[in-house]
Amino acid sequence: MHSNVSSLINDQINNELYSSYVYLDIANYYESKGLDGFANWFEIQAKEELDHALLLYKYLQNNGQKVTFEAIKKPECKFDDNMSPLQEALRHEKFITACINNIYAAANSDNDYRTMQLLDWFVKEQGEEEKNASDLVTKMELFGD
């Protein structure tokens, strides 16, 4: 594995941990509004993001690569209504998709087929995550705040 791909995967571990923070922040918002169903859904999403980070962490370890941890920034989300957390989730999923695509392109450029095989799962997962986030935005638009 080239150092560039390893570095990008290390960055993605941090991105996934940050994603977990973002979703916990959103869950906290909905919990404070008494919207337990939304809160629960985002708590589950937060756990999934942590699982993604652990998968990448183990992948680097199992391939003899150094894992480096960076500070996880605080989510800067300010929610004015019940729609804005859903829009933030969709925006964030699109960001994560772009990051995964960037790693995939680097792995492809390096003929790193093992990493590409791992990332195939992430590419599929991101398609599902973006659809779920988009569906929630659409439903909130239909039913109102």
Predicted regions and their residues:
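Iron-associated oxidoreductase/ferritin-like identity signal
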Residues: M1-D145
